[in-house]
Amino acid sequence: MDQNLYRKCLVILSMMAMIGTSMATYAGTPWRTASATFYGDDTGSATMGGACGYGNMYDSGYGVATTALSTALFNEGYACGQCFQLKCVSSPNCYYGSPATVVTATNICPPNYGQASNNGGWCNPPRVHFDLTKPAFMKIANWKAGIIPVSYRRVACKKIGGIRFKFEGNGYWLLVYVMNVGGPGDIKTMAVKGSRTGWINMSHNWGASYQAFSSLYGQSLSFRLTSYTTRQTIYAYNAAPASWSAGKTYQSKANFN
C-alpha cells in the first residue's frame, strides 16, 4: 500500500475512534443500598458552596438537587459532578410508591469519629451515605424521619449545553473549576492548550478544579478532558477567547453523553 494512503487511513481510523469514544452514552450502574440524611433548611441556602468548589449552586446550574457524599463515595473529589438516583426503601417514612429523585454530588460529608457509624457518624468510612439538601430529601421521604435507608444508582447526568469552565488564578497559574459535565459527570484528567502552546497537562487541585502553572494570558484556550468513570476523552476547542480573565465563566460546545 502507498505510504501516504496508509498514513491517511490511520488518521481516519484514529478520528473514528475518537468520535466513537466521545459519543458513547454513559449507562449508569446497578441499584445498591445506602442511607441518607439531609442538612440545611427548606431553601437549601446552607448547602451553597461545598468541597467541589461549584460556589452558588443556582449560578452554577445545580440548584438544590444536590448531595454531599461520604468519603466512601467522594473519592478525593473525583466523584464531584456525578449524578445519583435515589429512592427511599423499607421505611414507614418513605413516600407512597417510593418515588425516585436525581441529585448531583457537590460536597463531602466528613466523618465524625466521635460517634458510632450507626448512631450519628453516618459518614464514617466505610459507610456509603448521602447527605442531601432538605428539598431533595423531601422528594423521597418525610423529613421528620431524619435518616432513611435508600437504594441508589449512578445515572447519566443530563445537562443543557456544553461544559463550563470558571477561571481563577493569575498570570502564571490557571485554576479551572469544571461544571455542567454531562454523562458520567466526572473528570479524571485535564489538559489545556493555548493558541500559542502545545497541550499542557493540568493537575487535580481539589474537588472539581484543575490547575496549570503556565503563562496563558492573551491566548484562546482549549481543553482536553477525560472522564474518571468511562475514561472517555473529549476536546473543548476554543472554550475561552484570548481576552479571558480570572473570575469569569466560559461555556464550551463540548460535553459527555
Curated annotation (Swiss-Prot):
Q: Which domain of life is it from?
A: Eukaryota
GO terms for biological process, alphabetical: anatomical structure morphogenesis; plant-type cell wall loosening
Q: Where is the Expansin-like CBD domain?
A: 172-252
Q: Which cellular components does GO assign to this protein?
A: extracellular region; membrane
**Protein name per the record:** Expansin-A18
Quote the subcellular location field of this record: Secreted, Cell wall; Membrane
Q: Which organism is it from?
A: Arabidopsis thaliana (Mouse-ear cress)
Primary localisation category: secreted
Say which family it is in: Belongs to the expansin family. Expansin A subfamily.
| Keyword set includes Membrane | yes
Q: Where is the signal peptide?
A: 1-24
Q: Which InterPro entries match?
A: Expan_Lol_pI, Expansin, Expansin/allergen_DPBB_dom, Expansin_CBD, Expansin_CBD_sf, RlpA-like_DPBB, RlpA-like_sf
Query: Which residues are in the Expansin-like EG45 domain?
Result: 49-162
Topology class, membrane: Peripheral membrane protein
Q: Name the encoding gene, please.
A: EXPA18
Q: Which UniProt keywords apply?
A: Cell wall, Cell wall biogenesis/degradation, Membrane, Secreted, Signal
